[in-house]
A protein has these predicted regions:
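Mg2+/Mn2+-dependent nuclease catalytic core
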Residues: 165-267
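C-terminal, charged and often intrinsically disordered regions of DNA end-processing helicases
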Residues: 3-83, 319-324
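Nuclease catalytic cores
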Residues: 57-58, 62-101, 139-143, 160-164
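A non-catalytic, helix-rich entry segment at domain boundaries
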Residues: 11, 24, 92-163
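Hydrophobic (often cysteine-bearing) scaffold residues that line and stabilize catalytic clefts
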Residues: 81, 85, 138, 218-221, ...
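Short acidic (Asp/Glu) and glycine-rich catalytic loops that position anionic groups and cofactors
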Residues: 66-73, 90-93, 122-123, 200-206, ...
Length: 324
């Protein structure tokens, strides 16, 4: 079945037809869970940092107040169509690589996306869309992004070494946890005809790619994963890749031990800064252009005139966001 036919029958699977499917990716992997120390009547507990994920480390770098809202206060946020697309696409791509190489076709990926959405819609996003037409438009747009993926690489040409790899790694006094999308070995041939094998970490993104001048910042999480691989396997990955399906755009960065040593030091500094904020209760809000994408700008953030203890009602419009 081609893309056009697949789009036309977007709803051919009823949710009840795929109840046996289970979502293998831990749903709250990036929500660090600090322990509350000194909990007793009349005492405000002090959080203790126990684990840190790349996402939450990035949150603290961006804005300490954002980290507090997500990891300490655990303020719930409304799911968005962008999050749903990213979650569903990741699951579909994971299942694509579970198939024999000749079966990794666009048509199979479209079907896997429909299957994944039918199950995730019931379990995680039951009220995301207000109409059938809105859901159909979202589905067809999602299939267009998946079609773009096949213009970036041929999934039948290699076998991933790892898929959705759950990593929990102790580094000195820190525990770093996250999920690595994919890792594979590829053979690269240079202009002189010489070949070498590379260990590559790949991450999918369904949001728009940042401009090239900001691309290096987007590699923050992947450099953490490269560090975790070095610690657990004793080998330094050669390259990290970001595949932005909405474009499509591919960014790559070659990795070396010097970069990973610097990332180790950066994690040490972030861990210490988070522990200090937990002890002092000081979580400064750092305003920037990214505030326009923040779930808490219009409801909780003191930098925008709100009292976190008495949040304003959340706007009814869909929160702006980037697909994962």
């Amino acid at each position: 079945m081609g893309f056009r036919e697949g789009a036309a029958v977007w709803f051919r699977y009823a949710p009840g037809c795929v109840t046996a499917l289970r979502y293998s990716r831990p749903m709250d992997i990036d929500a660090d869970s600090p322990i509350l120390a000194g909990t007793h009547a009349g005492h405000v507990p002090t959080p203790v940092l126990t684990t840190l994920s790349p996402s939450r480390a990035s949150d603290f770098k961006t804005c300490p107040q954002l980290y507090k809202f997500k990891s300490i206060d655990k303020i719930p946020t409304e799911p968005t169509i962008h999050q749903a697309r990213g979650t569903t696409a990741h699951l579909a791509l994971e299942r694509l690589f579970a198939l024999p190489a000749p079966e990794r076709t666009p048509e199979r990926l479209y079907d896997l996306f429909r299957d994944a959405w039918a199950q995730l819609k019931v379990d995680e996003y039951p009220d995301l869309f207000t109409s059938v037409d809105e859901e159909r438009d979202w589905g067809i747009e999602s299939l267009h992004l998946l079609a773009a993926y096949f213009g970036m690489e041929d999934p039948s040409s290699f076998e991933p070494e790892e898929l959705e790899m759950d990593l929990t790694v102790d580094i000195d006094h820190m525990t770093i946890r996250g999920i690595l999308d994919r890792m594979e070995r590829i053979v690269e041939v240079d202009d002189a005809g010489s070949s070498r094998e590379l260990l590559v970490i790949t991450d999918y993104k369904t949001g728009r790619a940042p401009p090239p001048q900001y691309a290096n910042k987007a590699f923050f999480a992947l450099k953490i994963y490269a560090l975790l691989i070095r610690v657990t396997r004793g080998i330094t990955p050669d390259r990290v890749r970001l595949l932005y399906l909405n474009g499509p755009t591919e960014y790559t960065m070659d990795i070396n031990d010097r970069q990973l040593d610097a990332m180790h030091q950066q994690l040490e500094a972030l861990w210490a800064a988070i522990e200090k904020a937990m002890q002092t209760g000081e979580w400064p809000a750092r305003t920037s252009a990214l505030c326009d994408w923040c779930d808490f700008k219009d409801t909780h953030c003191p930098a925008w005139g709100h009292d976190p203890a008495q949040p304003d009602e959340r706007p009814t419009s869909d929160a702006a966001g980037a697909d994962g």
